[in-house]
Amino acid sequence: MTAAAPVITIDGPSGAGKGTLCKAMAEALQWHLLDSGAIYRVLALAALHHHVDVASEEALVPLAAHLDVRFISTHGNLEVILEGEDVSGEIRTQEVANAASQVAAFPRVREALLRRQRAFREAPGLIADGRDMGTVVFPDAPVKIFLDASSEERAQRRMLQLQEKGFSVNFDRLLSEIKERDDRDRNRAVAPLVPAEDALVLDSTSLTIEQVIEKALQYARQKLALA
């Protein structure tokens, strides 16, 4: 029996820098990449493309089970490919966001997508970006990292991102939203946002992104050399 391809899981709250870290690690190691946060949006978009009713669990399950999606990181940019087409921009529309929240509510859809996410595990290896990658999706991953940062730092980063896009934002409101989301995520009954017992907890509050990438790659290479 062939050994399963290695997986590096990167979990953590919104705004900690998971996406940037995962893209950098996938490029550095030349591994596959899974952006689990985007997968419900991709399924929602596939349903809209194929005129599948997003309110029908029965109709969505087979679509979820055979979802043709890939994630490609090039020069720090993430391309989301659905059925051979780059849909990176399309999955960010409000219509798709609304549909994604509907499809995510169905238990059988979540189960089908769990199996679909596990199918990303292919040689030479996988970088899995999410919130429950190390605890639920890939509990046997040889390398698990939980990337964290203070809520204030994450609000600051989000504010700068939005300002760069021309949006006017209120820091206190952003901070309040982040704290509320953290509370929901950490205390939910199913797959709460907690570090796996065997995860390295990496606090990025006072680190540059280059320092985070360096520490994560160093840790991963050490662990994989021992595995």
From Swiss-Prot:
Species annotation: Enterobacter sp. (strain 638)
InterPro entries from the UniProt entry: Cytidylate_kin, Cytidylate_kinase_dom, P-loop_NTPase
Xref: PANTHER family: CYTIDYLATE KINASE, CYTIDYLATE KINASE/PANTOATE-BETA-ALANINE LIGASE
GO BP, sorted A to Z: nucleobase-containing small molecule interconversion; pyrimidine nucleotide metabolic process
Gene: cmk
Annotated EC: 2.7.4.25
Annotated GO MF terms: ATP binding; CMP kinase activity; dCMP kinase activity
One cellular component term from this protein's GO annotations in UniProt: cytosol
Sequence intervals crossing the membrane: none
Keywords: ATP-binding, Cytoplasm, Kinase, Nucleotide-binding, Transferase
Family: Belongs to the cytidylate kinase family. Type 1 subfamily.
Protein's recorded name: Cytidylate kinase
Localisation: Cytoplasm
Highest classification ranks of the organism: Bacteria, Pseudomonadati, Pseudomonadota, Gammaproteobacteria, Enterobacterales
Residues that, per the record, bind ATP: 12-20
Reaction(s) the record says it catalyses: CMP + ATP = CDP + ADP; dCMP + ATP = dCDP + ADP
